[in-house]
């Protein structure tokens, strides 16, 4: 079986190979152009390119596997690093390997920042402790609206929908820094920097909801929009991975800013 829990910039994966009846294999796939490296049958790190950004990762298992390597397409290799597209890394152990936990940090800045994010957000906490802390964060966020009446199904639909409003925007800040695809630089900023907003739709009602229920979050989103303007000269329409996609017409950021004010 497998379990997964997350923080904002990190995740913990628990695998149990005790009763698998075959060898234990874990694969790390780099889908687009990128690099991957394996260290000591336990650590995997690398990056893949996405539009105007790179997504870096650092992963460490709580116990070493027996063997490891990389692959290019379908060809397995014992080499400790690989680069290109369609590459990845693998770790393997005999049947009955038992339980193993991977801690994975991500970053738009570099591998070291991914490692720092992992340490800052999970530290030495056990899987269940991270899961409970994550649950508490969501309880606080969703608990700002209390529903009276309705059926269990209706309340479940409501809170599921409220949960999904947090899909956009994304806090891209990392330890007092953030990467911007607008000018392709790393900026120093101690406050949150939000990105990735499908604003041709979200300007209609999502930002109004944030203004009413999560005003501190909405203010930082608007501050981030103004920051994007300062970086490249225009307010955003649909910014993705830290750059403008030029997908939609109009100026949806203007009513968002006015509504927030």
Regions found by a protein language model. Give the residues of each.
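Aromatic-rich carbohydrate-recognition surfaces in CAZymes
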Residues: 195-261
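Beta-sandwich/jelly-roll carbohydrate-recognition scaffolds of carbohydrate-active enzymes
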Residues: 1-194, 227
């Amino acid at each position: 079986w497998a379990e997964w829990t997350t923080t904002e910039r990190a995740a913990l994966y628990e695998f149990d190979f005790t009763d698998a009846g075959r060898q234990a294999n874990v694969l790390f796939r780099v889908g687009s152009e990128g690099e991957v490296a394996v260290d000591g049958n336990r650590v995997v790190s690398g990056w893949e390119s996405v539009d105007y950004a790179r997504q870096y990762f650092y992963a460490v298992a709580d116990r070493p596997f027996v063997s490891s390597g990389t692959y290019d397409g379908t060809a397995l290799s014992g080499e400790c690093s690989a680069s290109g597209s369609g590459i990845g890394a693998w770790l393997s152990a005999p049947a009955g390997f038992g339980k193993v936990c991977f801690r994975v940090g991500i970053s738009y800045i570099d591998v070291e920042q991914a490692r720092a994010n992992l340490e800052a957000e999970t530290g030495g906490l056990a899987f269940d402790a991270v899961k409970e802390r994550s649950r508490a964060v969501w309880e606080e966020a969703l608990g700002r609206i209390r529903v009276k009446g309705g059926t269990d199904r209706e309340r479940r639909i409501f809170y599921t929908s409220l949960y999904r409003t947090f899909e956009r925007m994304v806090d891209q800040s990392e330890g007092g820094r953030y990467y911007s695809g607008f000018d392709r630089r790393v900026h120093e900023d101690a406050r949150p920097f939000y990105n990735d907003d499908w604003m041709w739709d979200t300007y209609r009602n999502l930002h109004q909801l944030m203004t009413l229920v999560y005003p501190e979050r909405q203010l930082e989103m608007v501050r981030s929009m103004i920051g994007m303007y300062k970086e490249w000269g225009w307010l955003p329409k649909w910014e993705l991975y830290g750059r403008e996609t030029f997908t939609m017409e109009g100026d949806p950021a203007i009513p968002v800013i006015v509504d927030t004010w």
